[in-house]
UniProtKB/Swiss-Prot annotation:
This is DNA-(apurinic or apyrimidinic site) endonuclease. It comes from Escherichia phage T5. One of its GO terms (molecular function) is endonuclease activity. Belongs to the apurinic/apyrimidinic endonuclease family. GO terms for biological process: degradation of host chromosome by virus; symbiont-mediated suppression of host gene expression. Its EC number is 3.1.-.-. The keyword Ubl conjugation does not apply.
Amino acid sequence: MVIYEGNRFVAICRPGLLANYLNQVSPEYKGVINIYEGKAHYKINAVVARELAFQFLTFASCDIQVMGEALIAENEDDFINIFRKVYTERLIMKGAYIQSTAESIETAFRKVAQ
């Protein structure tokens, strides 16, 4: 995976270390983090990415709300699958919670190749 803060290169990392790298993103940066995994491209707000990584590293799990349902990541594969399955560009901070602004399944989840 290749990580950029906006257009500034940050790191190349194994998927299993994604949370560690996202936790180290500069707190002053408020823009979008771009993550490339092969041909896949994921975008996520830097504030949301840091909070998601912080929760995962601190509590050994993190959760997001998508259409009122909680998606919980309890291991590294689950954490990475949040990026692979959910439109992360729709995630926002709502108080202390991370929530998707999607209103339908089509706008909440990415199409996964069969």
